[in-house]
Swiss-Prot record:
Free-text function comment from the UniProt entry: Catalyzes the deamination of dCTP to dUTP.
Gene of this entry: dcd
Species assigned in the record: Novosphingobium aromaticivorans (strain ATCC 700278 / DSM 12444 / CCUG 56034 / CIP 105152 / NBRC 16084 / F199)
Protein's UniProt name: dCTP deaminase
HAMAP family referenced in this protein's UniProt entry, alphabetically: dCTP_deaminase
Positions annotated to bind dCTP: 107-112, 131-133, 152, 166, 176
Subunit structure as annotated in this protein's UniProt entry: Homotrimer.
Glycosyltransferase is among the record's keywords: no
Lineage, top ranks: Bacteria, Pseudomonadati, Pseudomonadota, Alphaproteobacteria, Sphingomonadales
């Protein structure tokens, strides 16, 4: 499995719509960096957040998730309460080629502040906005900045296309738009 370069990412984004909108050069002046890097793409977080709250003393159940456990906010700066988390999404819409698996890693700028970004791999054939989970591991409120870098996607090419892609098996998160809660 090979990690794919900026040249490959640029070509797929510009000619096949793999990443839309696509920022060709890494932006970093006065903001958390985003855009094309040497062997990856730093995606931005959209100004659409679901901030976890437990006012109803709910039990978190991935099989029966209570959507009222979140407060919806559209804002340029999201404040996550101490030891809590928020869901968000990428500005970018991704279309993953059939022979590629995409891994996401958090930005060190956030990690150094105790803010962890979690995303499961983007499977071959999947497309959509990526739902991001920001965990505030600190005992203090933490800020997330919309329209700035949130995480880096690394593109890994398999030795051959998979037999059954995410699209082939009609995965439950196929084509998701906006922040998407757990589905069964």
């Amino acid at each position: 499995m090979a990690i794919l370069s900026d040249k490959w990412i640029r070509d797929k984004a510009l000619n096949e719509g793999m990443i839309e909108p696509f920022v060709e050069n890494q932006r970093r002046d006065g903001c958390i960096s985003y855009g094309l890097s040497s062997y990856g793409y730093d995606a931005r977080v959209a100004p659409e957040f679901k901030i976890f709250t437990n006012v109803d003393s709910a039990v978190v159940d991935p099989k029966d998730f209570a959507s009222n456990s979140f407060v919806d906010r559209e804002t340029d700066v999201c404040v996550i309460p101490p030891n809590s988390f928020a869901l968000a999404r990428t500005v970018e819409y991704f279309r993953v080629p059939r022979d590629v698996l995409v891994i996401c890693l958090g930005k060190s700028t956030y990690a150094r502040c105790g803010i962890i970004v979690n995303v499961t791999p983007l499977e071959p054939g999947w497309e959509g906005h990526v739902t991001l989970e920001f965990s505030n591991t600190t005992p203090l409120p933490a800020k997330i900045y919309a329209n700035e870098g949130a995480c880096q996607f690394l593109f890994l090419q398999g030795n051959e296309p998979c037999e059954v892609s995410y699209a082939d098996r009609a995965g439950k998160y196929m084509g998701q738009r906006g922040v998407t809660l757990p589905r069964l």
